[in-house]
Amino acid sequence: MYDITLAAVSIGLFFYVGARAVLKCLFPRQTSFPKHVPVVGVRDEMLSITRASLRQLTNGITTLLDGYSKHGQRNRPFVLYDPSAQPELLLPVQHIRWFSEQPDSKLSSHGVRQERHAVRYLHMGDQVELESTTRFIRYASNDRLNRHLENLQGLLHDEVRRSVDCVFGSQRQAQDDHWKEINLYGAMQDLVFPIMCRVFLGKELGESDEERGRVLTVFRRYLMAMGISTIFIGELPRLLKGVVARVVRIPLAYYRSQTLRMLVPLVRSQLSRTKHDEDDDDERGSDFIKHCANLSTKSTLSGTSSEAGPDLIAEWIMMLAGSLGFAGSSSTIIQATNLILDLVNTPPELLALQQLRHEAERTLQDDSNWTQAASFRQQKLADSAIRESLRLHPILIKGLTKEVVTPNGLELPDDENTTIPMGSWVGVPVLGIHQDERFYPQASEYRPFRFVEQAEAARTQAGGGSYEDAPEAAKPTTTYLGFGYGRHACPGRWFAVLMLKMILSYVLLHYDVESTGPAPKTRVLGDAALPPFRATIRVRKRKLGSE
């Protein structure tokens, strides 16, 4: 009898805890934001918050723009639920500068990364301490991609030339005037990923093209698995994240082990080569592997850490692949796809492609120009075209998200003294701001030279007429948030813009491109804009001297 009673109590407790968990998932607590802050997307219906959250999976653009037009444009914050049933307060544009200046002791991105980026559930690597290693990688990538960016231009040019010609067509096509229809997103994947690997892993990825291709395939599969897992787990309610992550980690662990099996010997080989030739100035001595080793040695000499071996550096590269590597390559692929689609579908009377081609011919007259930073700084038209495409197609429709971590909450600088309680998520309605007619007339249209025209108009009013002061594509403002804003803006944005300029310049100088139909409308999964997977263009090798 005692055993039966104990079993009954145990079963009852099990179902009680399970029922509580399910109810918590289906009926999440109402937001504790002040009552005067409006909530967008929640209807008067059964399971209202759950259903509003589910709608955000595919209908996020409509809900965000509706909330922005009703509240954001009137300089009022509003609340939106994401697909995981997490409420987030979205700030009006006049609060963005103040928001970005708040210290990490008040607003932190740590908790957001743990949940929305699924770091808490997907991080692997027992010998890697997450936070300190993340700071180290951020410093190393900042140093590599920003301070020494010009040193990368030669190898970038070499890889862009090799990859574009491989994907777009051979020299023989110049003889028969052959047009080739390609899937643009797939083509950009085949371009951008090898370029990223060339920068971070160096040229010596294998002894043959076949081995190099095998290395790239393994690494690419890991990145895809990590990226899909991050988005999928990040959009789930907290109740389900841990459970589903246990299943997702199984294939992820397999791809991770395959990649490490390839990476560790590669790292060991390059470190050994570096030790035998400390004065090597060629590309083998400039890759990210050596850069990590050098920074590790400096830290060891200063007493702040121990020197990293091949296994640990391989882990660092895996972390880079899972954060900057995946985010950088995937976002650049989407940006490049959208940019070319926008340009080939620009009204022909604007002569956008012709003007960009002439600018590339003027700034890149020989191979030496490709290695000089000044050449691409002079490409104001390309800069404007890239900036305009990022404005129209931001990677995230809302962003800059942080969590209030101060116990007393955070008081907004508004007339109503709105206080946001601890634990709340706060962000910015990026797409709403980017499509605000107050900042961008005809905001729904792609106008490739919008920013040079604005700069030229401003200079004309001041007595000038040049567009040299047009804002750079990599420079965020409170109304241009394609790369984030403030001290936490994307660290690789200058590198990304340089890569986009190189790809665009090389394509226009060596190929004709044309549209196969209207560009598809942007779709989203949660906060993330999806790439136009099926969009195609036609390409043809240009004949020497042709217009």
Swiss-Prot record:
It catalyses: isomotiol + reduced [NADPH--hemoprotein reductase] + O2 = 2alpha-hydroxyisomotiol + oxidized [NADPH--hemoprotein reductase] + H2O + H(+). Keywords: Heme, Iron, Membrane, Metal-binding, Monooxygenase, Oxidoreductase, Transmembrane, Transmembrane helix. Fuscoatroside and some of its derivatives show interesting antifungal activity against Candida albicans and Aspergillus niger. This is Cytochrome P450 monooxygenase fsoD. It comes from Humicola fuscoatra. One of its GO terms (cellular component) is membrane. Pfam families: p450. Cytochrome P450 monooxygenase; part of the gene cluster that mediates the biosynthesis of the enfumafungin-type antibiotic, fuscoatroside. Within the pathway, fsoD catalyzes the hydroxylation at position C2 of isomotiol to produce 2-alpha-hydroxy-isomotiol. FsoD may also hydroxylate the intermediates 3-O-(beta-D-glucopyranosyl)-isomotiol and 2-deacetoxy-fuscoatroside at the same position C2.
